[in-house]
Every structure is written in structure tokens, then in C-alpha cells.
Amino acid sequence: MSDEHYLDNEEKSVVIVMSSGPSTPHRCATPFYISAILASMDAEVSIFLTMEGVKLGQTGVAENLTAMQGGKTIIEFMRDAKSAGVRLYLCKPAMPGYQLSESDIIEEVDEIANAGKMADLILACDKSLFF
């Protein structure tokens, strides 16, 4: 086992690329849960919603979606992550395929961005996760 402890390391950055969406609700809570934990451990965390993941940024979707019956809504997980300092990006090129316009997007999204931004985030981060 390593002698290093997470608090002994310099600041870390993590990018979570999330392509899961409403068709796979059981995959939608964990990325936000993990990101909140990482951010509370002083990591700089970004989540990039792409492909079907952009649907989670649509008003009314995450508010009415749970990963498991009787569980917290996905928007609650998203808000927990935001409260911990996680930045949330939404893929602009994916929006037309899901008939989304900027006026449809929830306030929790920090930035509507292109794939170049996602590539920059991935290349600059210490760790990347894909859901």
C-alpha cells in the first residue's frame, strides 16, 4: 500500500465525461455522487454532459428521474455536486439531436461548450472517468 495520503498530494483535477442519460437512470446518480466526494476532498472536478447525458441538463428531466425506485432525484445529486464546487458543462453539438435549445437548459449548468472544451479538460486533468 502506498505511503501517500490524498491530503499530502498537490491539488488534483478530475473530469467525468457523462454520456449516460434518462434511458439508463441507474447510471445517472453515481457520477454526481463521486464528483461531490472528490470535490469535498479538494479536487477540482468537472462533469461534461454529452450524447444522451445532455438530456439531464434539460428542464424537468433530472427533476423527475431517480437511479432507483424511492431514491433521491438526479437533480438532487446534481445540486449536491454543485454545492461541493463541481463545474457542469453541456455539449453544444449534442443539443440539436435531442431538440434542445439554450432556453431549455437548467441553471445548474455552468457552461454550454463544444468538444474542444471537453478535449482541453481531459488533456489538462489528472484523472478522467467515463459514465
Question: Which ranges hold each PLM region?
Answer:
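N-terminal beta-loop-helix "entrance" segment that forms/cooperates
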Residues: 53-67
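Anion (oxyanion) recognition and catalysis
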Residues: 39, 82, 122-123
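Short, glycine-rich nucleotide/cofactor-binding loops
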Residues: 14-29, 62, 68
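Short internal beta-strands
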Residues: 44-50, 88-92
